[in-house]
Design a protein with these regions (language model features):
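NAD(P)+-binding Rossmann beta1-loop-alpha1 motif at the extreme N-terminus of oxidoreductases
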Residues: 1-56
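Glycine-rich beta-alpha junction loops
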Residues: 41, 111-113, 132-137, 160, ...
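Short, charged/polar "capping" segments at the starts of alpha-helices
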Residues: 42-45, 116-117, 164-165
């Protein structure tokens, strides 16, 4: 069985945590090769020292098979996790075309209801699974990700996609010690996340304060 090839684009708070956990579990094994697509000082730090994840009192160091800002150095992958900001999506997808082959599944972990549609506007017919995460994390410095939430969750899926392939990815993520879910109705979870962030954004804008200070009141 050929190794799976999995790429994470955007190694920040979200991509750094999920990409780091998957790389920590699978890098150097016969199961999968993990690739990071990053840029700037963050990429430089990962190349020099690997990725450091601070998980409470525990620290994990890991490194991908390759960290690069040039997707052409990677080539087509089986699964591509897009973890950039929503406003960078179109530019990011254009840059990622060298890692997107006919069999590549794109899983965007971005907030928004129209992410799949926006990707299909650029790549008609490409297989895209919807995704969302619940996590408290941040990039504290180049090459260092801190997860400060007690629990994280990742949801992904596509009701029209091959179920065996979705189960394959679910098992892979769970084996990486992630709280992963492949629900029958992924749209329900996308809407729940949208309502949550919309409410939070409204409150923080109204009070002109970060969410922790709003909640404290």
């Amino acid at each position: 069985m050929a190794k799976l090839r999995i790429a994470f684009s955007g190694i920040g708070a979200v991509g750094g945590y999920y990409g780091g956990m998957v790389a920590a579990r699978y890098q150097g094994t016969i199961k999968a090769d993990i690739f990071f697509i990053a840029r700037g000082e963050n990429l430089k730090a990962i190349r020099e020292k690997g990725l450091q994840m601070q998980l409470g009192i525990r620290t994990i160091h890991t490194a991908p098979a390759l960290a690069t800002d040039n997707p052409a150095e990677i080539g087509p992958v089986d699964y591509l996790f897009c973890c950039t900001k929503s406003y960078d999506l179109e530019e990011n997808i254009q840059q990622l075309k060298p890692v997107i082959g006919p069999e590549t599944v794109i899983i965007p972990l971005l907030n928004g209801l129209d992410i799949e549609e926006r990707i299909h506007n650029i790549l008609p017919g490409q297989e895209v699974w919807k995704g969302c995460v619940y996590i408290g994390s941040r990039l504290t410095e180049p090459g260092v990700v801190e997860k400060f939430s007690l629990k994280e969750r990742i949801f992904f899926g596509n009701k029209d996609a091959n179920k065996d392939k979705q189960t394959e990815l679910l098992k892979l993520l769970m084996y990486a010690r992630l709280n992963a879910f492949n629900p029958a109705d992924i749209d329900l979870h996308i809407w729940k996340k949208f309502f949550m962030i919309s409410t939070a954004a409204t409150a923080t804008s109204f009070f002109n304060q970060p969410i922790d200070e709003v909640l404290a009141q």
